């Protein structure tokens, strides 16, 4: 069944729908995290009421289910935050190691407790590298065996990823912990903590690859640590810290972090197992390995590597000119519709402020500074630098304690403290705009992300719902975004 979205602004009025209420009244630090990119077929929102009370909302059913307690270190409260990833984190990692296999079967040492049929699986190294399809079936319980179709053989050298979903959680307080909940195994795994007392406000920001590639092409030459496309005209280092994937031909399936680039050559951070050549095709994507953590009323920005389970305190070329305080935000911009590259792969200039800002999806984290200011700062992932206090349309209103936000396809939806107003920052229009009003009376004003997005896609058409909880209440609502 297909549909055509004929809803139009002004003609059709946005309207809230009441949903099944939150299982518990929210409190300081309580937050929502959702599969806003529809990477798993479940329409999931996670409600982290506190470190011990965590719930899953199924949009398809309008119902809640309690999940296992996190066991995370720290003291839940101001600054607690999280992020959803489409990749499963079985055992706390994205890349899984097969223990054996055969024709269309992969043996694992994981205890998978649910049916993963229909979930995407891709092989990243070893026997079967380049395989990218869906799971046909799996056994339940210890040492689960995964079955696929297509006639590919796997063995103990096979490394693979499953798009079964995971939720990453940064706690607050002294000795604040960091942990991940994996859906396939229904298990929490403690990860390396950032190692500081965390509070005030916080945003954990992922850079997932599986939205839309930012660029693609055919290789004209390859070497141990390089990939050349002589048809390109990239800006120097515009793709640094993104990842490149070989999608066809020699070396298919390999993924590497891009350490630098010239106009026509990508240099990767570690040598190829098989050098790409003129038969190879590639795509440039967001880097699956990284999370960024900002907030804590400090200019310091942290980056977490899933592969190494380590945190890096970044040293930007230009430091952020003001600390992100109460009411700050953080959004990875990867799908602005008007940020289209030129035919040679180079981006267009948005503003010459600082090091220059380019209309390039996947390059920037946008962050309203909060702290009762209206400053908008941008972190340039490629150049590891901040561009501070950038001008934008309708700049006036300040964001303060309990303002919070969620981003979706180039728009940032911002709850304006406990005013009831939800505004929108449009990347395409580069302007702060009004959007809607939540009529529910606020209880005690509290911190934490209270907005989430769930999209619906079918037959090439799509639309999305904005979900909202409010201050110290159990009410839960949604609105169709028009």
Language-model segments: which ranges?
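Enriched but not universal
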Residues: 1-17, 21, 470-482
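Conserved short beta-strand element of beta-propeller blades
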Residues: 19-49, 54, 67-90, 163-171, ...
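Short acidic/polar mixed-charge low-complexity motifs
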Residues: 53, 63, 127-131, 187, ...
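Short loop/turn segments that connect beta-strands within beta-propeller blades
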Residues: 58-62, 182-186, 305-309, 380-384, ...
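Autoprocessing Asn-cyclization modules and mimics
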Residues: 88-159, 163, 181, 191-196, ...
């Amino acid at each position: 069944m297909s549909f055509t979205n004929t809803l139009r602004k002004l003609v059709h009025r946005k309207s809230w729908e009441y949903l099944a209420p939150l299982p518990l009244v929210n409190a300081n630090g309580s937050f929502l995290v959702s599969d806003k990119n529809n990477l798993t077929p479940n329409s999931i929102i996670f409600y982290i009421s506190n470190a011990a009370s965590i719930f899953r909302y199924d949009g398809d059913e309008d119902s809640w289910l309690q999940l296992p307690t996190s066991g995370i270190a720290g003291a839940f409260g101001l600054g607690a935050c999280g992020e959803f990833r489409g990749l499963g984190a079985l055992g706390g990692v994205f890349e899984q190691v097969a223990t054996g296999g055969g024709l269309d079967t992969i043996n694992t040492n994981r205890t998978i407790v649910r049916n993963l049929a229909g979930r995407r699986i891709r092989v990243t190294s070893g026997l079967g590298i380049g395989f990218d399809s869906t799971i046909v079936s799996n056994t339940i319980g210890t040492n689960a065996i995964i079955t696929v179709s297509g006639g590919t053989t796997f063995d103990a050298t096979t490394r693979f990823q499953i798009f079964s979903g995971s939720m990453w959680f940064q706690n607050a307080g002294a000795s604040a912990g960091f942990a991940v909940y994996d859906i396939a195994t229904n298990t929490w795994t403690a990860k390396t903590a950032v190692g500081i007392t965390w509070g005030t406000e916080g945003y954990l920001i992922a850079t997932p690859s599986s939205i839309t590639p930012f660029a693609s092409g055919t290789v004209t030459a390859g070497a141990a640590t390089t990939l050349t496309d002589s048809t390109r005209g990239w800006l120097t280092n515009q793709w640094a810290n993104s990842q490149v994937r070989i999608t066809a031909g020699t070396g298919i399936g390999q993924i590497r972090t891009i350490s630098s680039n010239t106009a026509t050559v990508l240099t990767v951070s570690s040598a190829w197992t098989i050098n790409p050549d003129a038969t190879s095709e590639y795509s440039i994507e967001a880097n699956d390995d990284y999370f960024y953590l900002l907030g804590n009323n400090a200019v310091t920005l942290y980056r977490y590597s899933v592969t190494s389970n380590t945190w890096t305190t970044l040293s930007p070329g230009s430091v952020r000119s003001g600390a992100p305080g109460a009411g700050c935000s953080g959004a990875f911009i990867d799908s602005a519709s008007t940020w289209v590259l030129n035919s040679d792969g180079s981006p267009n200039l948005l503003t010459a402020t600082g090091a220059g800002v380019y209309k390039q999806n996947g390059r920037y984290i946008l962050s309203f500074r909060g702290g009762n200011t209206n400053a908008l700062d941008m972190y340039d992932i490629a150049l590891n630098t901040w561009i501070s206090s950038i001008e934008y349309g309708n700049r006036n209103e300040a964001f303060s304690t309990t303002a919070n936000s969620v981003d979706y396809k180039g728009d940032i939806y911002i709850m304006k403290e406990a005013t009831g107003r939800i505004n929108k920052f449009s990347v395409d229009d580069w302007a702060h705009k009004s959007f809607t009003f939540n009529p529910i009376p606020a209880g005690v004003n509290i911190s934490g992300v209270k907005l989430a997005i769930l999209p619906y896609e079918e037959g090439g058409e799509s639309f999305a719902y904005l979900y909202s909880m409010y201050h110290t209440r159990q009410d839960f609502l949604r609105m169709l975004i028009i």
